[in-house]
Amino acid sequence: MALPPNSETERGLYLRNLFYNTSPVDVFTKWPKLTAEDQALVGRVINIYSFIEINLRRLVESWEDAALLPKGRIKDLPLGKVEELAQTVLPWPEHNLNALKRMAALRTFRNLVAHFGMLRFPDDDAFLFIAKSEADYKKQTGDESAEDAMLIAVLDGPILPGVVVELEGLLMWLATVTAQILKQKADAKAVPKPN
């Protein structure tokens, strides 16, 4: 699973140290749970990205149907391959290509909120993400985990609403582009072929 890249900042180190210096019992029993507003943001990230995936798949499948891609199992491709094809099949203007690349980068946030447990830091506007997955641990660190090691990430609170706003804009653009491309394809099929 693709996760956001690790970025060492002073703030991130401070937040991670708060976690490391707190007993797991206290983290799991005393740290604040997500608020209703937090949960709504998480749901929006997951839902918006689901619609981004739907539109990316519609594009790639339409290109396969139009013979821009070889016939095959396009419908079975993992999302990362679909994102790659969406970026490379057409000669996109630079700003459109950047939008597609940004969607792929932001999928890592969707993965984070969808696959990690989330808590709030007690005295900071920040989120703690916790997972226990050996495969993801190895992918992130290159090593096997020690007994009871957890994969964690931290995120400042204001970042998540900003991601939602950015994803909403990207989705609106992608939905419009997808509709235009599918309409062009339908219009081209409606033109009678010469005898």
Model regions: which residues?
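Short intrinsically disordered terminal tails
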Residues: 192-195
